[in-house]
Amino acid sequence: MSNTNDNIDNIDNIDNIDKIDIYYDITWSELFEKWWPKLTEILKKIYYNDRTNLKCVKIYPEIDNIFRVFRMSIDEIKIVLLGQDPYHGPKQANGLAFAVNRGTQIPPSLRNIFKQLQFEFPDRNYNFTHGDLTRWQDEEGVFLLNTSLTVIEGKPNSHSILWEEFTNDVISYIYRKRITYKYYKNNNNNKNNKNVDNKNVDNKIVFLLLGRNAQKKAEFVDMDNIITASHPSPLSAHNGFLGTNVFQQVENKLGCQINWSIV
């Protein structure tokens, strides 16, 4: 796999893309075993077609970070924070929605998220000095997913159609697995019954859908587990994100406080 931003130039034989290493937590095995043939075709379309038709095109994030978010166990998820697609500028996207690596300038969308957190929780004295959100995922259970996992440099939404079906299934998979866990726990003698009563839904997981693309995924989740807001991009943040209480709603649904600091 490539370890540079010039990732498409380092794939010597596109036919071998199905042999690249994808690291994910074991709790995602069922999903990836089901999807791997289709994922291989998606990656071939991205790297073969774009390299052939657009000689100098760059794809973000780097190929070894495309599935980075899935290194988190599904059992640890408290919040699915769903955005649109990766940052389409150089040295920004790192495989976690809205996040950037330390040393990278904080993008406007993430800056608005930080601004909103400071607005909602002034007593917590949050001080956001960088855009590395790894602690949110590792310690707070925030699953930082985009509806599209890749993007062409300078072209937002350029791969949204390619990833739509897969990320639909990701949302369904999370919801089904979390429901099934509680359902099976409460119905040990009837594990073959596929009918899940809504009263058994695990409400300790919240889907925060930011923007129109993310909100299209609402059909795969019970409404009691959903919070929606506009995307924090400067183009839409003032129309239903900034000045709201979206993160308070998340904590209220969870029944616990989230430490949104990044340290």
Cite the ranges covered by each PLM segment:
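Active-site-proximal or metal-binding-adjacent scaffold patches in catalytic folds
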Residues: 230
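Helix-centered, glycine/charged polyanion-binding patches within enzymatic domains
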Residues: 239, 243
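Compositionally biased, intrinsically disordered low-complexity segments enriched
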Residues: 2-20, 184-204
